[in-house]
Amino acid sequence: MKPITLLPTLFIAAILTINGLGCKKNNSSEESYLAIKTKFGSRIDPANLANYASQGKPAYILKDNTAGNNITNAKATLGRVLFYDKQLSINNTVSCGSCHLQKFAFGDTALASLGVENGRTGRHSMRLINARFSNEAKFFWDERAATLEQQTTKPIQDHAEMGFSGQNGRPTLSTLLTKLQNLDYYKELFQFVYGNQTITESRLQECLSQFVRSIQSFDSKYDVGRAQVAQEQQAFPNFTQQENMGKNMFLMPPQFNAAGVRTGGGLGCAGCHAAPEFDIDPNTGNNGIIGNLNAPGIDINNTRAPSLRDLVGTDGQPNGPMMHTGGIRTLQAAIGHYGQINLAPGNTRLDPRLRPNGFGQNLNLNQQEVDAVIAFLKTLTGSAVYTDQKWADPFQ
């Protein structure tokens, strides 16, 4: 009889053992992200990541400067946390998101953004929307970063911005890496994304750049119209007469006389800001604004610009001041600047398209033309990018 009773007993014991191990494994899996859940609640869920990798884009959008660092949901999620984490500054007061606010198309309304210990940025903070969709791979106004990956950790190491400069007694980036390594939620996030807890500058760059490249806006009035026509030059059926006029003025090159005065054609904006991405031409010189934001002298090296998409917010107002100095606050003033270019002494890098026949261009604009271009620029504003939670601050 013993063999008969022994087998069921062993069988039941085996089942209980397996079930016990299974429960232990499940509990371990749940507890492995306890720090993430404690810090972020439902805003970051490793089991249900936001969609960054396959958002899609219109068929007419062809430019892409990703260059091998393709977006994944996991790395972009980690990039989002890094982007908004004030722990990335020396005194835990400033994050990337402090100077690039979602409600302003990831730009800033301040002329110079506030850094650590009352430091100020040397140039106005550039909007980040659609940074991926450009032939220009370099970043910063002066293009000093060869890639977005390189750009992402330079503000962290800037003495005035986030402070890990290694200058005047300040800590270096290696101190930050150790600091992050000791935060429980980063231990879990890096383990989740990379399979280990090692934190390096290249990993910060990889994740931050993926998050920034994921920020896209293609639900504007312009996009609705562009999807209905075969070519950019055709009238958009959803545009007003004024908006279509402004589009034509934007796209058409101007005709100049020998003195550089416009006698016909459009404004030629698309020569540097080509549709449909409205990104900056990589071969562009500066635009004639050569002042410094908070220092004397001139700076002729600002040849980069953000996309003109979402230049204006959903309220019809600019998403902060324009140009590297932040010195232009209205679309009227921006168009006025290009309407009459002054050839300043020492500006050897002025874009040649702005000095026809050796003269600073005079577009000879009338108010109807200005109003039409303004109306067109406002059609480039999307909506979802301002409120989509996958780009929002996960710490709030």
Regions from the PLM with identified roles:
Residues 138-181:
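Glycine/proline-centered hinge or cleavage motifs at structural transition points of membrane proteins
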